[in-house]
Amino acid sequence: MKIIILTSSRYGTAAHHLPYLIESGTCEISMVILNEGRIKKNFRYLKNKVRKIIKIGPLGALNGIRMRKWFSHDISIYKEIEELESICYRYDIPFHSTPNINTRSTEDLFRKANADVGLSLGNGYIGQRIYSIPKYGMINIHHEILPDYQNAQSVIWQIFNMSSITGYTIHKIDKHIDTGDLLLQGTIPIEFMGSLRRTVARTSVSLLEASAIGLVKVLGDLDQYYTSAKPQGPGKSYTTPSIWQYFKILRNHKKLKEASDNSMYEKDVHKAAENVRP
């Protein structure tokens, strides 16, 4: 089976998952495409930006920009990820770039690749003109649980809702964001660290490792997963937190961290007691 990978990051999910796919031998990677993200700042773009700022507030918007590193650069503290183009060069995989996702350039590259299925790893909205080109369409990895956390950043909204569990979802791509039929889901515990920032970065590494294994599983038996795919049903969509929502996330993080520490302490005491011999 031939797959084409579309990504918007040189050091993100695609760079992490590509070695897993190569080593698994479950598929042939016909091409990797990097979206350079050259956004046309037209009226529609500016209108959407203003609408978002009104919704989450100027401080929320600025804080959102500050938090971006938590989900990208900070991951390197816990996991070294090789640059994507370097991996492609080493394994002789065709690597191309495109100015933006929904462009003629991307469309032409997809047709040239002639892949059976497309794989989206770390992208924004993908239009039908792109995702309908591969024989079996495209699939996406969303690092949260669907449909409850559509368009949500990993970990933070779980903490907002006082949950100590996060996860990933592999799903088909349709005309909306994070709404396609479900193929596979997995959950992991949030790894609470001394700060929210470190908690996000450390848990994101565990999410990457879990979703890479899940992706290999799906691609290894794609027909079966497509046959058993389930529609999502009603869901809830998220965006960047407002500054007040962020403060709530910080408070909840402190509570959940304390609960996690107490739980670990109790487990250690219980384990030590079991090891005591008369």
Mark where each language-model region is.
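One-carbon transfer enzymes
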Residues: 1-278
